[in-house]
């Protein structure tokens, strides 16, 4: 089965690579329209997936990731339309010039070819990834989690109908609908057909892909994100940022998981934090230095376990640790962070600059929420993933991250001397 999918995707990629920006945008507009026109089919399929997942004991955080609503589905369709409005990087000349030999040389952006994406209970990923791949002239093979099998099947069917109505092969966007995990291992060895693999899931999936894949892998999306509260912070303003970073949508990878508080501001900051977190329904996991003071406040508090500093809660839980200074905060982030998104809240711009320079994450913020690490927020449109590695792509992966380049030399029957 996968062999035939690979062949179909590779053949489709050749056709997609030749499309003009106008032709690709026409396809995307058709997909967005069909997602709305056939929303009832997709939402009914999703309702069945959610019901099964709840019956199987899936956590509330994961159920939130899985669930589609009419508003969310409309937002997904609107994201596709936003991709239409983005500049097409394919065909862009990055640089070039004329050599001493007279050869005119240029470096031009081209599609990667076929992208493979493995993801879990995130039905929006199906459309986000498909739209970005189509905009950049790439075919895609999707493997969603078993929790989203009906939703993904319905969504991909809509996309394939739109492709065919525009005269393009259905092989441009395909999904593996068999939940057999053995197919993941088979997919990881499809280097004959797949040019880049992107896993979007937990640490176990990333480890599996790194160890078994014969395809170049882009890893990321695991977000143990930190906010350091410096001693010069404006407490009321800082609390607004922390509430946003923790509670806006707790199940996302750019949600803050650990709060590092400078010891010199702890006495005034912790009571205010407790009040705010109680109002927001957040459970605080406090270290020994913060525990007694937080227990005197209204928020629910438990003693932090050492391993929780490495956890991506994806829920209304927040670690709180008292640190001696900026050096201590940076050391903690280096030990426990996942190089996703980290922030400092401070009025001291020297400390802010040090934090930016010394914290080696894909996104670093000064006096801003970690929730901004998102393709849409960055103006990239929908994102295919958030990469926390350094080669090829880093941070939210938009259109350019789905391209490579080729060297083109144009001569006049020019030969090398």
From Swiss-Prot:
InterPro entries referenced in this protein's UniProt entry, alphabetically: Ald_DH/histidinol_DH, Ald_DH_C, Ald_DH_N, Aldehyde_DH_dom, G-glutamylP_reductase_CS, Glu-5-SA_DH, GPR_dom
Catalytic reaction(s) noted: L-glutamate 5-semialdehyde + phosphate + NADP(+) = L-glutamyl 5-phosphate + NADPH + H(+)
Family note: Belongs to the gamma-glutamyl phosphate reductase family.
Protein name per its UniProtKB record: Gamma-glutamyl phosphate reductase
Known regulation of activity: Inhibited by p-chloromercuribenzoate, copper and nickel ions.
Described purpose of this protein according to its UniProt entry: Catalyzes the NADPH-dependent reduction of L-glutamate 5-phosphate into L-glutamate 5-semialdehyde and phosphate. The product spontaneously undergoes cyclization to form 1-pyrroline-5-carboxylate.
The keyword Aminoacyl-tRNA synthetase appears for this protein: no
Keywords: Amino-acid biosynthesis, Cytoplasm, NADP, Oxidoreductase, Proline biosynthesis
Influence of pH: Optimum pH is 7.0.
BP GO terms, sorted: L-proline biosynthetic process; proline biosynthetic process
Domain of life: Bacteria
Entry GO MF terms: glutamate-5-semialdehyde dehydrogenase activity; identical protein binding; NADP binding
GO CC, one annotated term: cytosol
CDD domains: ALDH_F18-19_ProA-GPR
Main localization of the protein described in the UniProt heading: cytoplasm
EC number: 1.2.1.41
Pathway the protein contributes to: Amino-acid biosynthesis; L-proline biosynthesis; L-glutamate 5-semialdehyde from L-glutamate: step 2/2
Pfam families referenced in this protein's UniProt entry, alphabetically: Aldedh (PF00171)
Compartments in which it is found: Cytoplasm
Subunit structure: Homodimer. May form a complex with glutamate 5-kinase (proB).
């Amino acid at each position: 089965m996968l062999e035939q999918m690979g062949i179909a995707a590779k053949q489709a990629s050749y056709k997609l690579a030749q499309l003009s920006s106008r032709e690709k945008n026409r396809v995307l507009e058709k997909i967005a329209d069909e997602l709305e026109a056939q929303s009832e089919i997709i939402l009914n399929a999703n309702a069945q997936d959610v019901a099964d997942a709840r019956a199987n004991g899936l956590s509330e955080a994961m159920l939130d990731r899985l669930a589609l609503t009419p508003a969310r589905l409309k937002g997904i369709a609107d994201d596709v339309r936003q991709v239409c409005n983005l500049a097409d990087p394919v065909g862009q000349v990055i640089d070039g010039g004329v050599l001493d030999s007279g050869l005119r040389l240029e470096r031009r952006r081209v599609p990667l070819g076929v992208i493979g994406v493995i993801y879990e209970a995130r039905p929006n990923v199906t459309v986000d990834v498909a739209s970005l791949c189509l905009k950049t002239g790439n075919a895609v093979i999707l493997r969603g989690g078993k929790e989203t099998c009906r939703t993904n099947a319905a969504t991909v069917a809509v996309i394939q109908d739109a492709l065919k109505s525009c005269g393009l092969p259905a092989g441009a966007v395909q999904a593996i609908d068999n939940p057999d995990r053995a197919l993941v291992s088979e997919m990881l060895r499809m280097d004959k057909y797949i040019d880049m693999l992107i896993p979007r899931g937990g640490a176990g999936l990333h480890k599996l892909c790194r160890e078994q894949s014969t395809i170049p892998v882009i890893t990321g999306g695991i977000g143990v994100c930190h906010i350091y509260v410096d001693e010069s912070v404006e407490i009321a303003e800082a609390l607004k940022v922390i509430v946003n970073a923790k509670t806006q949508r707790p199940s996302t990878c750019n949600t803050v998981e650990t709060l590092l508080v400078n010891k010199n501001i702890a006495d005034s900051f912790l009571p205010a934090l407790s009040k705010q977190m109680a109002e927001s329904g957040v459970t605080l996991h406090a270290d020994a230095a913060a525990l007694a003071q937080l227990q005197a406040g209204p928020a629910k508090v438990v003693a932090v376990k050492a391993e929780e500093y490495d956890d991506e809660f994806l829920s209304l839980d927040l670690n709180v640790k008292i640190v001696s200074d900026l050096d201590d905060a940076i050391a903690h982030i280096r030990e426990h962070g996942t190089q996703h998104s980290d922030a400092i809240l401070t009025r001291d711009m020297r400390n802010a600059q040090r934090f930016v320079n010394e914290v080696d994450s894909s996104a670093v913020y000064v006096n801003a929420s970690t929730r901004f690490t998102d393709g849409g927020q960055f103006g990239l449109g929908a994102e295919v993933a958030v990469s926390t590695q350094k080669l090829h792509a880093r941070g939210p992966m938009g259109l350019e991250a789905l391209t490579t380049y080729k060297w083109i030399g144009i001569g006049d029957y020019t030969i090398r001397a």
